[in-house]
Curated annotation (Swiss-Prot):
Top-rank EC class of the record's enzyme: oxidoreductase
Protein name: Very-long-chain 3-oxoacyl-CoA reductase
Entry's Gene Ontology molecular function annotations: ketoreductase activity; very-long-chain 3-oxoacyl-CoA reductase activity
Active-site residues (renumbered): Y220, K224
PROSITE patterns: ADH_SHORT
Membrane spanning stretches: 19-39
Subcellular location: Endoplasmic reticulum membrane
Length: 346
């Protein structure tokens, strides 16, 4: 063997060894991080005790602001935050509903309430001024951005009515951002006055529709995906001020928006869903791969974690499944509407 051949063989051997070690390192790293993620998922969901809301000022005269508070998930947020000892500002469209809920909360939980009638479909500066006027003199520590709207039924983007498109973007995005702009400085001021002995909390409702690009719900899906990026960015900005920010991702919940009435293991009622949110506030649960995000209900968490760690949320496979499912839902909804119209005609 010539000297050149000998040197070449040694060089090739070293390169091969380096490649083998590199592959082994990546493999060990992947296995380790996956194992830690699984462990963190299980600990968040099933081991750690419920979060004590005293860290957010519960039973200390502090206030929570809840949007979309007259029905479903928003109403349940109001009740459960009050049960933990927070006074509550209720924001929704129908004043009569808000007043009834406020009376029930004050009677049952012995806390104070404020109500603000607010039509989220109208992007009106006077409405935001009304909110700011109410909360500016209150020691607010918690904001729940719950108000939202989806499509009446799954619909192709090119057939989406202009009003529905505008309402979805206005309610899910513009209103959420502008209410947060009004309330977050009040939360920061409250935390600062307490010398950070209490923390602030901003929860914004996300959706599997934003996690997974969803054909036939394209506008809604995009609006919720926007909230993912916005909420994570906001979390980075407000963390130094002692405010926790989280996007709350859910699959289906029984509500007027989902049009589902019967709960199941994978479709909780609002009470069980909100309990999971508040008990795990600040933890990632099923959203182990995402900063400042939580998927708190246990079956939703397992679904989210499974999708992220197998096919991926942006995969063609996931998109195709979503396409088929929502196309089928649309067909059934149109047939149901046709039968209803035929009955009226008869």
């Amino acid at each position: 063997m010539s000297l050149c051949q000998f040197v070449s063989s040694i060089s090739d051997c070293r390169i091969t060894q380096a490649l083998i070690y590199g592959v082994l390192f990546v493999g060990v790293y992947k296995i380790t991080t996956f194992t830690l993620s699984v462990g963190s998922l299980l600990v968040d969901l099933f081991v750690l005790p419920a979060v004590d809301f005293k860290k957010y000022g519960a039973k200390q005269g502090k206030w929570a602001v809840v949007t979309g508070a007259s029905d479903g998930i928003g109403k349940e947020y109001a009740y459960q935050l009050a049960s933990r000892g927070l006074n509550v500002v209720l924001i929704s469209r129908t004043l009569s509903k808000l007043e009834l809920i406020a009376t029930e909360i004050e009677t049952k939980y012995k806390v104070s309430t404020e109500v603000i009638a607010f039509d989220a479909s109208t992007d009106n500066d006077a409405n935001y001024a009304k909110i700011l006027h109410t909360v500016s003199n209150l020691p607010v520590t918690v904001l729940v951005n719950n108000v939202g709207q989806s499509h009446s039924i799954p619909v192709p983007f090119l057939e989406t009515e202009d009003k529905e498109l505008r309402d979805i973007i206005t309610i899910n995005n513009t209103v959420t951002l502008k209410i947060t702009q009004a309330v977050a400085p009040v939360i920061a001021d409250t935390v600062a006055k307490e010398n950070k002995k209490v923390k602030g909390l901003i929860l914004t409702m996300g959706s599997f529709g934003g996690l997974l690009p969803t054909p036939y719900l394209a506008t809604y899906s995009g609006s919720k995906s926007f909230l993912q990026a916005w909420s994570s960015a906001l979390a980075g900005e407000l963390k130094p001020q002692g405010i926790d920010v989280q996007l709350v991702i859910s699959y289906l919940v029984t509500s007027a928006m989902s049009k589902i009435r019967r709960s199941s293991a994978s479709i909780p009622n609002p009470k069980n869903f909100v309990t999971s949110v508040l008990n795990t506030a600040g933890r990632r649960c099923g959203a182990q791969e995402r900063f400042a995000t939580t998927t708190p209900y246990w079956t939703h968490a397992l679904m989210h974690f499974g999708i992220e760690n197998t096919v991926g949320v942006y995969s063609k496979f996931a998109n195709s499944l979503n396409f088929s499912m929502h196309k089928s839902i649309r067909v059934r909804a149109l047939k149901k509407a046709a039968r209803a119209n035929a009955t009226k005609t008869d």
